Amino acid sequence: MNKTVFKSPEAKNKIIRAYDDAITNSSLNLKANVLKTTFGDTHFLEAGSQHQEIVILLHGASSNATSWLSDIAEYSKQYKVIAIDIIGEAGKSAETRPSYETIDFAEWLKEIFDSLNINKANIVGLSQGGWLSLRFATSYPELVDRLILLTPAGIIPTKTTFIIKAILYSLLGTTGRIRINRLVLGSQRVDNKIISFMDLIQTNFKARIEKEYIFSDDELSRLTMPVLFIGGEQDVIRSTQKIARRLQNIVTDFTIIVIPEMGHVLTGLVPRIFPFLNKTKH
């Protein structure tokens, strides 16, 4: 039986209330839906249903689909957007946490594709959502049109210095949370709403802490679709240069964008992503 991923029933309620408030306060025409899967109920947000081509958004760890709201507003002008609450994370989907060592996460996403009759889609994954995107794209490359990886996990290990600091800061309560956020954000300026969101999740959610799964060269060589990697030069969690170098050596159709003024929190990048998405298909 799965233990709850929230720190208490009230902690879960706080996150869900914030989730609902974020949607209410947005001006988006969103549909909220739930799908049954082998791994439990999966909740997702949908916009731009008048468009044919699909963009699927996969958020990072300790997050949920509302983290994409500003991006959904942009993507939905040209694409049908599906922002999924990843199972086992801080959203409205089941609290199931499949193993990173198996292809269960890919099978879960495949069930969503099948249920929604999706033959092919563009996928945008951020951090751990980038890892999930890679797990799916290497398992079912024929279902992915274009792959956009925003500072993805799974290419190189997380920096040991960051892990040590994060563990130490996690013992310091509120002060520690502030320090972790400061460390992750670096000198990057972000909206106060993002900082409040990060603090809410850290206070009320049990982050998943397990051994990382790093994809092999053989697995990454299955990425036959066009791949865009975007990283922040100031990322303290994983080296943007090392990720770019490894992918460049393996992936045939590969594009890199490095943003000097950004760290690990990559927001407002849709204008940079659209040219890649909208390239003429061969």
Model-derived features with residue positions:
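Catalytic histidine-centered segment of alpha/beta-hydrolase-like enzymes
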Residues: 262-272
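Active-site loop/oxyanion-hole signature of alpha/beta-hydrolase fold enzymes
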Residues: 83-124
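Acidic catalytic loop of the alpha/beta-hydrolase fold
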Residues: 234-238, 264-265
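Hydrophobic, aromatic-rich cap/lid helix
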Residues: 191-218
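Short beta-strand/loop motif that positions the catalytic acidic residue
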Residues: 223, 229-231
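Conserved HGGG/HGGXW glycine-rich cap/lid loop of the alpha/beta-hydrolase fold
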Residues: 40-91
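Flexible "cap/lid" loop of the alpha/beta hydrolase fold
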Residues: 131-139, 144-174
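Alpha/beta-hydrolase fold catalytic core
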Residues: 1-53, 78, 119, 278-282
